Design a protein with these regions (language model features):
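Short Cys/His-rich Zn2+-coordinating modules
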Residues: 88, 128, 175-176
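Cysteine-centered iron-sulfur cluster-binding motifs in ferredoxin-type domains/subunits
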Residues: 97-102, 187-190
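Conserved active-site and cofactor/substrate-binding residues in soluble primary-metabolism enzymes
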Residues: 61, 119, 137, 189, ...
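Beta-strand-rich solenoid/repeat architectures in extracellular/passenger domains
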Residues: 86-88, 109, 202
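Glycine-rich hexapeptide-repeat left-handed beta-helix
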Residues: 144, 149-152, 158-316
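Right-handed parallel beta-helix
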Residues: 96, 108-151, 156
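Terminal amphipathic alpha-helical/low-complexity segments used for targeting or macromolecular assembly
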Residues: 1-100, 259-264, 268-317
Length: 317
């Protein structure tokens, strides 16, 4: 029952929420991307017909389109925090640009951090930590409990409880992702519980300056983008010194080691890159439980079952 807004997972809307006061089907570029249900009405959809309302946003054809959404949405998303009560400029910080574009919501910032706010706001959420030796160039969002351990960070977003060091540009880190050492990550999407070994580096631009194509399980996908780094699935891991080519896809649960430069497509739950060896389900679950316990996250029966289903679905062939 309403009121409710139901959105397609493959569409990122822009602007303020819309309440047309009546049931409507949201449409973007000729496609149905959501529905709004007023209070007191029941939704029996999804429907592809009915009264429609045009809405602006970004269609997500695949994970790589999160990079386009990041470019288009992050500046405004960070700016939305500017009116919130916050801690102001931390003592000992160096600020380039308008200091009101730095929003600290209970973060811990060591002296000597550089905030470059000339191209966008920097938002540090509750419990975030930024160490000395860090330069943050907005727009940047640092999620609750995330630690920025040093380096140059620009135009990126980090979910909760990430660990980040080195150079990161125009990238999305989902929650609990770990990059605690030096190395460059650019125009990449890093899934939850990923661990990037020391020195892991992504290429985000072809030497030909041509558009990037992905190779996914035998299929080639045109991204239409000049800059695409790596798309790394949940719980994947890379060995120290790993070099990832432009447009590399590392699938869920894969453990990348055995070669400095892995192939551009690493299948789900791969164990190394030398052949077709795959992790066992029990082996994967044991590792996931160890990793989560280090972050004080309970490996519940529900979480275990969810990962079992993910393993089964991803390894059917």
């Amino acid at each position: 029952d309403g009121p409710a807004i139901i959105g397609a997972a493959w569409f990122a809307p822009t602007g303020a929420p819309i309440d047309p006061g009546a049931a409507r089907r949201f449409v973007h570029a000729g496609q149905t991307v959501g529905w709004v249900i007023p209070a007191g009405e029941r939704w029996d959809g999804p429907h592809t017909k009915g009264p429609e309302l045009a809405i602006e946003g970004v269609l997500l054809r695949g994970t790589f389109d999160l990079l386009t959404a990041l470019e288009e949405l992050l500046p405004a998303d960070c700016a939305d925090f500017l009116a919130a009560p916050n801690d102001g400029v931390p003592v000992g910080s160096v600020v380039l640009g308008d200091p009101t574009h730095l929003v600290s919501l209970g973060a811990n910032v060591e002296p000597g951090v550089v905030f470059d706010l000339r191209n966008g706001a920097v938002v540090l959420d509750q419990g975030a930590e930024v160490r000395n030796g860090t330069r943050l160039e907005g727009p940047v969002y640092v999620g609750p409990g995330t630690r920025i351990l040093g380096g140059f960070i620009r135009a990126s977003v980090f979910g909760s409880e990430c660990r980040v060091r080195g150079e990161v540009a125009a990238s999305v880190f989902l929650g609990f992702a770990n990059k605690s050492h030096d190395g460059f990550v650019g125009h990449s999407v890093i899934g939850p519980w990923v661990n990037l070994g020391a020195g892991t580096t992504t290429s985000n631009l072809k030497n030909t300056y041509g558009q990037v194509r992905l190779e996914v399980d035998g299929q080639r996908i045109d991204t239409g983008r000049l800059n695409v780094g790596s798309l790394i699935g949940d719980h994947a891991k890379t060995a120290i010194g790993t070099m990832l080519a432009t447009g590399t896809v590392v699938s869920v649960g894969a453990n990348v080691f055995g070669t400095p430069m892995p192939p551009k497509y690493v299948p789900p739950f791969a164990w190394g890159c030398a052949g077709s060896e795959r992790m066992t389900e029990d082996g994967f679950l044991r590792i996931a439980e160890r990793v989560m316990s280090r972050r004080n996250v309970t490996f519940s029966a529900e979480r275990r079952e969810s990962l079992r289903r993910t393993f089964a679905r991803s390894t059917r062939r």
